[in-house]
Design a protein with these regions (language model features):
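Bacterial Sec-dependent N-terminal signal peptides
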Residues: 1-21
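Transmembrane beta-barrel strands of outer-membrane/channel proteins
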Residues: 24-28, 60-64, 94-96, 128-134, ...
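Repeated loop/turn-to-beta-strand initiation elements of outer-membrane beta-barrel proteins
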Residues: 22, 55-59, 86-92, 121-128, ...
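Outer-membrane beta-barrel transmembrane domain signature
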Residues: 135-202, 208-213, 233-235
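Solvent-exposed loop/turn segments connecting transmembrane beta-strands
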Residues: 39-41, 65-74, 100-109, 138-149, ...
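Outer-membrane beta-barrel "beta-signal"
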Residues: 223-235
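Short glycine/proline- and aromatic-enriched beta-strand/turn motifs that initiate or cap beta-hairpins
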Residues: 18-67
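Membrane-embedded beta-strands of outer-membrane beta-barrel proteins
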Residues: 47, 76-78, 113-115, 152-156, ...
Length: 235
């Protein structure tokens, strides 16, 4: 859930800026696709933090997928950016993605490195980032292999109605790999819309839109739209 990053790219203009939030989402995916997503989580808890410093910024999030009886999985992305120049909105971006599932073992881990172009409007009401990254998937269990990939990422955040509403999200495009070793384009986007009741508490929704991302053994369907209903607390 990289949405949080877009809302705090503006902090790169200041030193030692930091912010953190926690989100709780009820997921309707299993209701919409009872066969294809029969094992999908109902609830996801997310912790995110962004911190800017003299060299650039740190960012991470942790997703916990929950059921009534257990934690189904934990997934994290942690990234570091090093500013190229104070006069240029460019940064060197390095990242690690991975996690563990209680039923499936580890997620396929990946390391990423590349360049990021970050920007914001003069009033800081809109922020954006475009990243072009080399991506290396590692062999995580018996049924997959290590391979090289390329990822293009866009991240955005917009405040409007006097900061009462926030629209943020990301979209990723990368080369995935089928079981037969052939490549495929994977698309994943998670836009969020929040109504900010106070400076700390928000209610809203996230919609996970994907193609060739969800592992489906029931049929040949590859495109899914999974909405949530969520609450967020900004520390």
């Amino acid at each position: 859930m990289k949405q949080f990053l877009s809302l705090f790219l503006m902090m790169m203009a200041f030193q030692t800026a930091s912010s953190q939030n926690i989100q709780l989402h009820y997921d309707f995916g299993r209701n919409l696709y009872p066969d294809e997503e029969a094992t999908r989580q109902k609830v996801t808890a997310t912790l995110e933090q962004y911190k800017a410093d003299d060299w650039g910024s740190w960012y991470y999030f942790v997703d916990l997928d929950l059921s009534r009886k257990e934690t189904l999985g934990a997934y994290t992305e942690i990234s570091r950016e090093f500013n190229v120049s104070k006069k240029l909105p460019l940064a060197v971006h390095v990242e690690y993605d991975g996690g563990l599932g209680s039923r499936t073992g580890s997620y396929q881990q990946a390391a990423l490195a590349g360049i990021a172009y970050n920007g914001y409007t003069p009033t800081f009401s809109s922020t954006w980032s475009v990243q072009l990254l080399y991506k290396r998937f590692f062999k995580s269990y018996d049924f997959n292999t290590a391979y090289n990939s390329l990822q293009l990422t866009g991240v955005w955040g917009v405040h409007f109605f006097n900061h009462k509403m926030s629209f943020s999200g990301f979209v990723d495009f990368w080369r995935g790999q089928k079981a037969n070793g052939h490549g495929q384009l994977v698309i994943l986007s998670e836009p969020q819309l929040w109504y900010n009741i106070t400076n700390h508490f928000s209610i809203g929704s996230e919609v996970e839109i994907s193609n060739n991302f969800i592992y489906n053994t029931v049929n040949d369907k590859s495109f899914f739209v999974n909405p949530t209903l969520g609450v967020k607390w900004n520390f």
